Amino acid sequence: MVKNSPISVIPQEEKRGSVEFQVFNFTNKIERLTSHLELHRRDYLSQRGLRKILGKRQRLLVYLSKKNRVRYRELIGQLGIREPKTG
């Protein structure tokens, strides 16, 4: 599995507490858990953890889309995240 470096996705001056950095970290965790669950389909605790991380990332993305729509669109484009359905 190839990991994206935070430097290529997020500018150097961004802090670790920024919404973009947190979304990036959650995306890496989601990718790792997804590859783990492909091998271990019945690992229900990991499935639950994956759902929790997905929810956290979704809440952060909603927050970012309300605060700064341009940065939101750039981030989902760089990370390859689909835009959520509305309605």
UniProtKB/Swiss-Prot annotation:
GO terms for biological process: translation. Its main location: plastid. SMART domains: Ribosomal_S15. It comes from the Eukaryota. It is found in: Plastid, Chloroplast. GO terms for cellular component: chloroplast; ribonucleoprotein complex; ribosome. GO terms for molecular function: structural constituent of ribosome. Keywords: Chloroplast, Plastid, Ribonucleoprotein, Ribosomal protein. Belongs to the universal ribosomal protein uS15 family. This is Small ribosomal subunit protein uS15c. The lineage of its organism: Eukaryota, Viridiplantae, Streptophyta, Embryophyta, Tracheophyta. The gene is rps15.
